[in-house]
Structures are given as C-alpha cells and as structure tokens.
Amino acid sequence: MGDPRARAARTKRDRTRRALLDAADSAFGSRGWARTRVEDIAQSAGVSAATAYNHFPTKHALLAQVYAPIINPLLVQARQDIAAGRPVTEALSDQVRALCRLCARNRVLTSAFYAAASEYTIKIGALPDPGDDADPRTLVPMTEALELLIGYGQAAGELRPYPSARDLSGLLVNTVLIRNVNRPGESADITAELLLTVMFGALRPEELVGAERPFPAAR
C-alpha cells in the first residue's frame, strides 16, 4: 500500500501545487503579466516564494500551467475531428471560432500569456525547444490544433499546400493574440471572421469567390 509518509508528502505537494495554480489564475487573470509577482502569488497561496519556485521554475512556467487547461480542449477536439474523418473545412471553421471565443472569454489571462511568450521568445531568441520546461510556447502549444487540421487537409488534397500548416497556424494564432491585446473591445465573432477569411483565402480561395464576406461575424 506504500509508505504512509510518502503518501502524505505527495498529498501535501499536490495541495500546494493546486493552491499556487488557483492563486496564479486569480492574480494573472485580474492584474495581467507585468503587475503580477510570483512572491505575491506565493503569499496568496500561503507558501513561501521558494516553495513556489520549487513547483514552477519561472513565472513564465507558472502562467503557462494556468493557461494550458484553457487551450488543451482545442487540441483534443482537433484529434477527434481527424479520427472521425470530419470535413476539414467544418473542423477548421469550428476550431477558429472556438479559439477566438476562448481568448475573448479569458482576455486578461490571454494577454498575460502573450506577454510571457513574447518576453521569453525575446530572451532566448529562438524557436521553442520541446525540452525546455520553462518556455510558455512549449507548455501551451497554441498552434498545434490548427497545425494538425491544416496539415491533415493538405495531405488529403483538400487544402492548398502553401502556406505550410506550421507557418499558417502560427500566423493565425499570433493574429488572435495581438488583436486580443490591441483591440480589447473586439468580439470573438469579428476576430473569427477575419481569421477565417485569411485562412481560407490562402487554403481554399474558391470558398471566397463571389462573396464579399463569406464568413459573416453574425453566424
């Protein structure tokens, strides 16, 4: 049955981790990236800053662990859509709309993630390293769901092969993140309309022929 002391230690670690994540969610979600300190999060969670850093190596990693559960369902849905053989245009349309809704619903937290990812990118000056457990871009692979679906459609010949799935998914996600910061009053539907027009304009231009606004925001 295991060592009771070891079980108690694991339980304590799990509770501490949960308390830190809850405190971080509240802090980043209300104060954003720049005005939130790990020390303040630790105090709210009832632990020392050293304990917080034992669980999360950097402020960037802590924020990423808070934000990842918001984004992970998109990747789950993309994999399910591919496994079910769902039409890729439908899957991509729903994926883009869902991404825009999630970002709008969690606007301050999304802005904090964008700030953290940008700061880390500038710091290391390189693409994400899968082995870097402090890189928010690795811990929250925001582009992966779109990249999977676009790549799937391109491999099946349903979408044009250029731009590549990686390049286009990155462009789309960066656009969402930037507009989330620069246009805080913009609705998710408006953002999604823009992204869908750009995406299908590149991958399925025939979808746009004869329509001034083929993906109206009112949908």
PLM ranges: what are they?
Residues Q80-D81, R97-A104, A115-T121, L196-L203:
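Helix-loop "lid/cap" segments that line or gate small-molecule binding pockets
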Residues M1-P4, R101, V140-A156, Y162, ...:
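C-terminal peripheral helix-coil segments that are non-catalytic and often amphipathic
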Residues C100-E147, V181:
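Short secondary-structure transition hinges
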Residues A23-A27, L102, T175:
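Short amphipathic alpha-helical elements of helix-turn-helix/winged-helix folds
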Residues Q65, R79-N106, S169:
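Hydrophobic alpha-helical connector segments
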Residues A19, A27-A61, Q65:
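Helix-turn-helix
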Residues T110-Y114, I122-G125, E158-P163, E207-E212:
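Short, hydrophobic secondary-structure boundary micro-motifs
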Residues R13-D25, I41, V66-I70, L74, ...:
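Generic hydrophobic, amphipathic alpha-helix propensity
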